[in-house]
């Protein structure tokens, strides 16, 4: 996949995570809801500050992240794969192993 986000944008591929109901039943597909975890597949050069400096992003390609899946997150199909385009500010956390 060839895509290069601009500025503070990040491209994330959603990861499927196993969900369980309160009763311990494993939920899959639409019953589980959409995952808010994903893998960063591309990052922009950074956020342009008011003084013209560029602040590099904290996330990097390969990071697993938890993100806010709401307004401002755009889903796109690229090479038959769905990816999410978001600002770094839509990312809530980096999952460290």
From Swiss-Prot:
SUPFAM superfamilies: GroES-like (SSF50129). The keyword Chaperone applies. Gene3D superfamilies: GroES chaperonin. It is found in: Cytoplasm. GO terms for cellular component: cytoplasm. SMART domains: Cpn10. One of its GO terms (molecular function) is protein-folding chaperone binding. Its main location: cytoplasm. Together with the chaperonin GroEL, plays an essential role in assisting protein folding. The GroEL-GroES system forms a nano-cage that allows encapsulation of the non-native substrate proteins and provides a physical environment optimized to promote and accelerate protein folding. GroES binds to the apical surface of the GroEL ring, thereby capping the opening of the GroEL channel. Belongs to the GroES chaperonin family. PANTHER family: 10 KDA HEAT SHOCK PROTEIN, CO-CHAPERONIN GROES. Heptamer of 7 subunits arranged in a ring. Interacts with the chaperonin GroEL. This is Co-chaperonin GroES. It comes from Edwardsiella ictaluri (strain 93-146). The gene is groES.
